[in-house]
Amino acid sequence: GEPFLHPLLPQFITIAHQKGFIPILTTNGTLLDNAQSVIDAHPHKVQISLQAHEGNTKENPEEYIREVMHFAKEAARQGIIIVLRLWNEGGEHNSMNPELLKLMAQHVPTPWTERPDGWKLSELIYLETDTTFEWPDTERAPYEQNEAFCHALRNQIGVLVDGTVVPCCLDSQ
């Protein structure tokens, strides 16, 4: 689920810190306009999946990127790592990538420092690109039992939208 929907998210981040965890959030970035309380709770990293824009109802890319970049710059000022993700290379939903990059450059001027997985836009703000991510599905062929292995529980947990804690975000069923 979208973590920014949960009204207790800042408290969850605080509790995670108290228990010795390193809170990392992944969001589609559509609810960042009122996220100061999340910044104040100071997660270690926030990953924003920009490719989600084409699949969501937010029709105005300028407003979307303005909100994302405002959040990113404010969070980075407070020492939070921001990873903007475009994981849709080679997919059918990437026609807006050039426009999104152009809009980002209005907020964080180029040239950006190239990295193996994308670019460093500014201090603590990164843009990562990758191929389209497909969730593993045991119902989809071809699938072999030994093919799917999740390393998540070794260094992370998932929290589902209903608050259920799972070893891996794929454990929703």
Language-model features: locations:
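Radical SAM/AdoMet-radical enzyme domain recognition
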Residues: E2-P116
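Accessory C-terminal segments flanking Radical SAM cores
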Residues: K120-Q173
